């Protein structure tokens, strides 16, 4: 007979904190404006929060790479996972400058969610995994199984940043 005890559960999410990104962008711009090697490069970093994008621009690819390095260092300092960034191709912009768009990953894409669910199912642990919009919910009777699933997921690389939230225990 099924017990009426509610399941323990947690959510697997992928979220980037935009206020932290905003801070990192401001700090990166400050450093870029002070750097002698980037002085005349007309470099810029613009966060477009509504689009979950960062736009980078600089006078050439070499300087754009330097701008990216500065930004990444500032993001790491603010605990923003670099795995949560997807880099578009470098394209020509106005004049002789180049630009690049970075997309901030918010939510788990359906293909990735399916891979995560499959890994959990194949592990034969006594849990259920279900896709709920842009997150995956894992539930099970015993907490140890949930802990094992977390360990399993930490060891797997889906090429995305994942966090475990909404841990509910009975």
Regions found by a protein language model. Give the residues of each.
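Helix-adjacent hinge/juxtasegments
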Residues: 63-101
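N-terminal, charged amphipathic alpha-helical interaction modules
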Residues: 38-70
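Positively charged, low-complexity, intrinsically disordered RNA-binding extensions
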Residues: 5-6, 10, 46, 99-170
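Short, conserved charged micro-motifs
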Residues: 20-21, 62-67, 108-112, 145-146
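N-terminal, positively charged regions that mediate nucleic acid binding
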Residues: 4-40
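Short amphipathic alpha-helix segments
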Residues: 22-37, 71-72, 109-121
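Short amphipathic beta-strand starts and helix->beta connectors
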Residues: 36-43, 82-88, 113-125
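Short, hydrophobic beta-strand segments
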Residues: 8-14, 51-58, 95-106
């Amino acid at each position: 007979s099924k017990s009426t005890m509610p399941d323990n559960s947690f959510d697997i999410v992928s979220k980037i904190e935009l206020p932290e990104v905003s801070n990192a962008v401001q700090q990166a711009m400050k450093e870029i404006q002070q750097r002698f090697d980037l002085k005349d490069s007309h470099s810029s970093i613009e966060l477009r929060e509504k689009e979950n994008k960062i736009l980078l621009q600089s006078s050439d690819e070499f300087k754009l790479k330097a701008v990216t390095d500065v930004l990444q260092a500032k993001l790491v300092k603010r605990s923003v996972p670099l795995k949560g960034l997807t880099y578009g191709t470098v394209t020509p912009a106005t004049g002789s400058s180049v630009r690049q768009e970075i997309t901030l990953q918010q939510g788990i894409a359906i293909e990735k969610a399916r891979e995560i669910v499959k890994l959990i199912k194949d592990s034969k642990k006594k849990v259920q995994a279900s896709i709920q919009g842009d997150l995956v919910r894992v539930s099970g009777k015993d907490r140890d199984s949930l802990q094992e699933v977390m360990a399993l997921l930490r060891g797997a690389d889906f090429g995305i940043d994942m966090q475990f939230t909404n841990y509910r225990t009975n």
